[in-house]
Amino acid sequence: MKSYFRPEIDALAGYTAGEQPKIANLIKLNTNENPYPPSQAVQDALRSFDIDRLRRYPDPFADELRDIFAADANVKRENVIVGNGSDDLLTMCFRAFTSPDHPVAVFEPSYSLYPVLAAMQGAEVIKVKLDSCKFTYPADGAQQAARANMLVITRPNAPTGTLCPKDLVRQYCREFDGIVLIDEAYGDFAADNCMDLVKEFDNVIVMRTFSKSCSMAGVRLGYAVSNPIIIEGLMKLKDSYNVDMLSQIVGKANYLDKEYRAKCIDAIKRDRDDLSNALQNIGFEIPESHANFLFAAPPDGDGESCFRYLRENAVLVRYFKGDITGRYIRITIGTPEENARVLELLNARYA
């Protein structure tokens, strides 16, 4: 059959999302979801919701959420755009700033969706390599990315969990003559963030998601903060009603319960560090994680074998093929009971 697709789409491999298994009694630690439920405020908001409202369209701009996010970032509503998950906002940015004549630069390894979005635009991807052992960032990163129109920094990085020092991020923003997109999907698990750089530099976009620290991966909600001119341009690219009514309502309820969210984050960070120390004691190589997961190389350096062993024992983690990433598995931090089971299995195999 004749193909009606653009050549870029025909050649596209597509993004491989983390497996969402239907198997009962499987410990699922492969997609960096929060092990704890959303705030009770979400259930209360759903109980009080008037279902008759669903016959109406939602606020196309999610202005109530924009005001809440703006207040937290100490900016104005005009500095904020809300999306159907941060992937929606990433898609807008790639549509806005990349093309066959406008390359994008990404650090390698990082989020595997970026090259897919670039390919959809027919854009070249300039890969700036991280150190292959500790996954540290090069001081000349902006120079390596100089031909690009957009530089993407995942902070903390996925899948490694490492953190580009804020002073180095600031240096990149100052030296790079293009858009600097800082993807802070895991930012709440780190010691600091880059939201204030939006006011320091006109070329910076900082992006957040509700899928990790907010326990709402199933809702699909995210937001980005930048200067008003960039936000105005991105507004032209969004779907007309890109954030549904229920997402806006439960997103607000959940986000405002900051005390509960902070307790969940603290528990995850504590368990992350405990599991990291325990695995290193039996020979795992783990770069310091600032996220809600560990990037862990087993003592024999065979990440795929370790992944399969855990899967055979009803624990699902993530494995990424590759010369560097293939040595590792990525383990989402789960409940204390789930983490204990992971440690029990890995102790049995490697200790």
Task: Annotate each language-model stretch with its function.
Residues 269, 281-313:
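Conserved PLP-binding catalytic core of the aspartate aminotransferase-like
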Residues 1-56, 147:
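N-terminal "arm"/small-domain region of PLP-dependent enzymes with the aminotransferase-like
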